[in-house]
A protein has these predicted regions:
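Conserved MFS/SLC helix-loop-helix module at the cytosolic interface between two early adjacent transmembrane helices
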Residues: 79-118
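Helix-breaking motifs and short loop linkers at transmembrane-helix boundaries and internal kinks
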Residues: 60, 92, 113-119, 130, ...
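Extracytoplasmic gate region of multi-pass secondary transporters
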Residues: 48-49, 243-299, 354-358, 362, ...
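Cytoplasmic helix-loop-helix junction between adjacent transmembrane helices
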Residues: 123-162
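Structural signature of the two symmetry-related core transmembrane helices
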Residues: 95-109, 315-332
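Helix-loop-helix hairpin linking two adjacent transmembrane segments in secondary transporters
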Residues: 158-210
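Residue-level signature of mid-helix packing/kink "hotspots" within the transmembrane helices
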Residues: 46, 74-82, 166-167, 289-293, ...
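A late C-terminal transmembrane helix in Major Facilitator Superfamily
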Residues: 366-403
Length: 439
């Protein structure tokens, strides 16, 4: 990226061991902004899922129709990931994040104007396109602001914003619609206003390390103490020539559908299986996503701890991913749980496993690729994940209309992570730095 700082020639692992953490915490303020953006992204994304039982009763939606809304959202999201992956490499995360949140705020407000599944599917296209810029922008910012030894932890922190957003959404929407007895459209209006506050804060507070007015010299040196990287650009075809790219993309294709379907369909599962509604969705969803929040942080902490103990980067990432894959297995039995809280425990454990697994998978572009190629790879990975999510959402909607059972979905969720890790290891056994264009 053009606005990256000059770096020292010392290897990052050596520097991290020789230099103590610096004075100055600007990078953690940046991490806090990234965390807040992910929270808002997930709130805006999940409002519709929480409202689904009410909107289905009001407007006669079918599961297949709702599957179309979520499926086409993911198509637009995948295309947006390709766009923003390419764009962030060229304009940087500051302008990129402004553009992304501006677009998704327009789409979020547009949902107040429609009632049919077709109308919602169309209104959510700009929402999906804009939200697709969240992780390319956040990961690019993390690559700017955090050395390798801290990067997985930083990613884990802002990745946990997804779970905080998922926790807040049912409580907030339940308060607005069930307690205050407001029209459902107010759920979109109130949550959309939060985005405008964040946009103002981001524009004022985010700058790259070399030009940030509040960074200390010690903190800048800590961030810049990595090998100088040759600047350049890498297109899609260039990135796709490398097996390491396919390991990342395949991982996203296999595990992202699990998270997507949990996000969009869990309220419906609790409604159809246990009779829960907008007034009592809160406690089970809060419990699930608090568990997921812990998983995101622990997954990043565990691999970062292994790295600080001298474990090779690829081995540390894969150890953490394997542990997470094992914790996902019990969710295969969630559909048969007689008690909602047994189901919550199984699903929450799987969500924690997903977040820990994805935290380490998301670290791959920063670990293995030059910075000018990372956004492109992240975009390709997001497209692959959205493609998998589209297939899963369409299939689940049709399955529910025909047989009314979530059982096949939960079985697939349980085994997805072990399969993903196996394919990942086959395609990326040595986890070495990728050379692009002779760099």
């Amino acid at each position: 990226m053009s606005d990256l700082t000059q770096a020292a020639a010392t290897a990052p692992d050596t520097v991290a061991q020789a230099v103590p953490p610096p004075r100055g915490r600007v990078r953690w303020v940046i991490c806090g902004l990234l965390f807040a953006a992910v929270v808002l992204s997930y709130i805006d994304r999940l409002v519709l899922g929480v409202l689904k039982p009410q909107l289905t009763a009001l407007y006669g939606w079918t599961n297949s129709g709702y599957g179309d809304i979520t499926g086409y959202f993911q198509v637009a999201y995948g295309l947006g990931f390709l766009l923003f992956g390419w764009l962030i490499d060229r304009i940087g995360p500051r302008a990129g994040y402004m553009l992304a949140m501006g677009a998704w705020t327009v789409g979020h407000f547009a949902q107040t104007l429609v009632t049919s599944t077709t109308g919602f599917a169309l209104a959510r296209i700009p929402l999906a396109l804009g939200e697709a810029g969240t992780f390319p922008s956040a990961l690019a910012a993390a690559s700017q602001w955090f050395p390798k030894k801290e990067r997985a932890m930083a990613i884990g922190i802002f990745n946990a914003g997804a779970n905080v957003g998922a926790v807040v959404t049912p409580l907030l929407i339940g308060f607005l619609i069930a307690d205050l007895v407001l029209d459902w459209r107010w759920a979109f209006i109130v949550t959309g206003l939060f985005n405008l506050v964040w946009l103002t804060a981001w524009w004022q507070l985010y700058h790259p390390p070399h030009s940030h007015p509040r960074i200390t010299p010690e903190e800048r040196a800590w961030i810049e103490a990595e090998p100088v990287e040759t600047t350049g650009r890498a297109g899609f075809l260039t990135v796709l020539r490398h097996r390491e790219s396919w390991s990342y993309m395949t991982g996203r294709f296999l595990i992202d559908p699990v998270w997507w379907t949990f996000l969009f369909w869990l309220p419906d599962f609790f409604h159809s299986r246990y009779g829960y509604d907008l007034k009592n969705f809160g406690p089970p969803l809060v419990a699930i996503y608090i568990m997921a929040d812990v998983g995101a942080i622990v997954g990043g902490w565990y691999s970062s701890r292994l790295l600080k103990r001298g474990v090779e980067t690829g081995r540390a990432r894969k150890r953490a991913m394997f542990a997470c894959a094992l914790f996902a297995l019990p969710v295969m039995f969630a559909a048969q749980a007689s008690s909602i809280w047994v189901a919550v425990a199984m699903i929450g454990l799987a969500c924690a496993a997903h977040q820990g697994f994805s935290t380490n998978l998301f670290a791959l572009p920063g670990d293995q690729f030059p910075r000018y190629a990372q956004g492109t790879l992240i975009g390709l990975g997001g497209f692959a994940g959205a493609a998998g999510g589209f297939i899963a959402s369409k299939a689940l909607g049709a399955l529910l209309d025909r047989v009314g059972s979530y059982q096949p979905f939960f079985i697939a969720c349980g085994v997805a992570y072990l399969v993903a890790l196996l394919v990942f290891h086959i395609l990326n056994p040595r986890y070495r730095n990728v050379r692009i264009g002779g760099v």
